[in-house]
């Protein structure tokens, strides 16, 4: 999947949890990605993060650090 689309999706998820005002938002975002994203999508977004993570919301970027690196 194109990194731009994954970034947009991750940022939408981050915006939802940010609006909830939860201190645990990064963990909640990571949990959502683990539950609902295909492992290939997680692999692709992590590759994007490793390449600099352009366009990612800071909250989404924090969540990416919590994702397992192997599925």
For the regions a protein language model found, what residue spans apply to each?
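N-terminal intrinsically disordered, cationic/polar leader segments
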Residues: 4-7, 27, 57-58, 64, ...
